[in-house]
């Protein structure tokens, strides 16, 4: 296992030390952001709805910041898991290094929430001294040597043969699932996907039916409702493998995942009994009907309305397309 990686002389030991230190700094910055947003949206210790509406950019930014910091935490745990197993190769070291370099820079300089929205720490009420305290020696080391052109170029060289890094699964079953779906894609999807695209064809129903038999649509649905009950990680692994072959196939299972979770968490017992087994089996294929003219996927701005009329609903509005 190489000790020095890419252009800068950072040993494996130094990389882990810097990442652990930087994660602590990120946690402190997150605490300052949480305190800042609380000051913007709270009155007398409680969230004020009017203030929350007014400061939704800051509140939204706090969610992003929390996610970024948790991402750093999980990346470090991934690297440590591989190191303990003796599988922390040059590629995985570079991936960890690039991830920390990029996220630490964004946490200090701005998170791109969209093309026209960049969140700065000050937008969440974070004082300048908290940002200055965040920029420790280890944070600056990773910011300046992490996600650099030489690091990215070396990653590109290492993944050219199809090895995209060890995912570090802590469950052997996930590796088996990954292999199973990679074989399925190599046999049933990859050889045909480009022609489907060129001919603007729907994914053949035979492929969808085989995916249903493999359990794609019920991965996270509990066994009680006819699913596999395997959890979010399995769903991510399967989606990644299907998407590797063809993005259209990769998106099929995610709609079922979203619909099943919404019904499981908020549905009545009758709705669960009716829909969950059928979603898990692939008998029902949910779709996401979001996009509207002049709206995109801004769910807060949707104009379509459903009004109860006896035992049914009257739906009025315009949709541009749906996503399956």
Where are these regions (language model features)?
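Glycine-rich, Trp-frequent "lid" loop and neighboring beta-strands that shape
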Residues: 169, 227-228, 247, 270-324
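N-terminal glycine-rich flavin-associated loop
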Residues: 250-270, 296
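Glycine- and other small-residue-rich loops at beta-strand/loop junctions that grip anionic moieties
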Residues: 196, 200, 264, 291
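Residue-level "edge-of-site" marker
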Residues: 224, 255, 292
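Conserved protein kinase catalytic domain
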Residues: 239, 260-263, 276
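Flavin-dependent oxidoreductase catalytic core characteristic
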Residues: 1-225, 229-232, 236, 241-243, ...
């Amino acid at each position: 296992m190489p000790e020095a990686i890419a252009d800068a002389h950072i040993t494996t030991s130094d990389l882990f030390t810097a990442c652990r230190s930087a994660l602590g700094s990120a946690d402190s910055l997150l605490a300052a952001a949480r305190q800042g947003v609380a000051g913007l949206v709270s009155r007398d210790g409680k969230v004020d709805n009017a203030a929350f509406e007014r400061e939704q950019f800051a509140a939204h930014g706090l969610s992003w910041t929390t996610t970024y910091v948790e991402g750093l935490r999980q990346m470090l745990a991934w690297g440590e898991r591989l190191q303990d197993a003796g599988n922390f190769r040059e590629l995985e070291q570079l991936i960890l290094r690039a991830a920390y370099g990029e996220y630490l820079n964004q946490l200090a300089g701005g998170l791109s929430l969209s093309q026209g929205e960049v969140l700065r720490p000050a937008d969440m009420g974070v004082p300048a001294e908290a940002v200055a305290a965040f920029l420790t020696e280890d944070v600056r080391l990773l910011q300046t040597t992490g996600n650099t052109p030489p690091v990215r170029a070396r990653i590109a060289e290492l993944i050219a043969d199809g090895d995209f890094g060890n995912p570090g699964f802590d469950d052997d079953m996930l590796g088996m699932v990954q292999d199973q779906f990679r074989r399925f894609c190599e046999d049933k999807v990859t050889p045909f996907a480009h022609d489907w695209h060129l001919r603007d064809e729907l994914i053949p129903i035979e492929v969808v039916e085989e995916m249903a038999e493999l359990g794609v649509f019920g991965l996270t649905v509990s066994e009680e409702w006819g699913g596999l009950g395997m959890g979010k990680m399995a769903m991510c692994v399967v989606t990644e493998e299907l998407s590797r072959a063809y993005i259209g196939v990769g998106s099929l299972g995610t709609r079922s995942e979203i619909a099943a979770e919404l019904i499981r968490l908020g549905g009545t017992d009758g709705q669960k009994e009716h829909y969950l087994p059928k979603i898990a089996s692939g008998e029902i294929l949910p779709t996401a009907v979001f996009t509207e003219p002049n709206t995109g996927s801004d769910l807060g701005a949707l104009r379509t309305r459903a009004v109860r009329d006896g035992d049914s609903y009257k739906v009025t509005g315009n949709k541009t397309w749906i996503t399956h």
